[in-house]
Curated annotation (Swiss-Prot):
Naturally occurring in which organism (per UniProt): Borreliella burgdorferi (strain ATCC 35210 / DSM 4680 / CIP 102532 / B31)
Signal peptide extent: none
Keywords: Chemotaxis, Hydrolase
UniProt xrefs under InterPro entries: CheD-like_sf, Chemorcpt_Glu_NH3ase_CheD, Cytotoxic_necrot_fac-like_cat
Gene Ontology MF: a single term: protein-glutamine glutaminase activity
Keyword Hydrolase: yes
Chemical reaction(s) catalysed: L-glutaminyl-[protein] + H2O = L-glutamyl-[protein] + NH4(+)
Gene: cheD
Function comment: Probably deamidates glutamine residues to glutamate on methyl-accepting chemotaxis receptors (MCPs), playing an important role in chemotaxis.
Top-rank lineage group of the source organism: Bacteria
Protein name, as recorded: Probable chemoreceptor glutamine deamidase CheD
């Protein structure tokens, strides 16, 4: 996790890397995604956002507790719990999902697709509404999530979108 002042945004930003999650009511949260997925949760009533960044859905190996955030099967429940521990109400949670790029050649394992489908299915099981999904299978992206309005700015190599 890296905290810095972003001169373009004129804001304090916390950058998370694979395996990390962060919850805030003040700081913009950012990450860079390829095949990984970031789940961004919001409780607008409590002005709270959280973001995780996971690499794979699961592992067939034993995972040490400090590595669990790298896997969606752990990362999504951990993010939900972190939101609740910071004052969010489960009934207020809403989600936006990003990432899931497939860089591999045709016919290869589609890690990005598996990651994105897992996020959607898991949030549906938790009954958390998904307000936006950005799973373009061909583009990496950098995302910035804002706590005051749940706006997420996505920067691609060829442009920018707001979700």
């Amino acid at each position: 996790m890296l905290n810095h002042f972003n001169f373009k945004l004129k804001r304090d930003v916390t950058i998370i890397v694979p395996g990390e999650a962060f919850v805030s009511n003040k700081r913009v949260i950012s990450t860079i995604l390829g095949s990984c997925v970031a789940v961004v949760l919001c409780d607008e009533s409590n002005n709270l956002i959280g973001m995780n960044h996971y690499v794979l859905v699961k592992s067939d190996l034993d995972i040490s507790p400090d590595q669990r955030g790298r896997y969606g099967i752990y990362a999504i429940p951990m993010l939900i719990n972190a939101m609740l521990e910071n004052g969010a109400s489960k009934s207020n949670l809403k989600a936006k999902l990003f990432g899931g790029t497939n860089f591999m050649a045709k016919g290869s394992v589609k890690v990005g697709l598996e990651n994105s489908e897992f996020a959607v299915n898991t949030l549906n099981k938790y009954r958390i509404p998904i307000l936006a999904k950005d799973f373009d299978q061909s583009k990496s992206r950098k995302i910035f999530a804002f706590p005051e309005n749940f706006k997420v700015i996505v920067e691609y190599p060829d442009g920018t979108k707001v979700f």
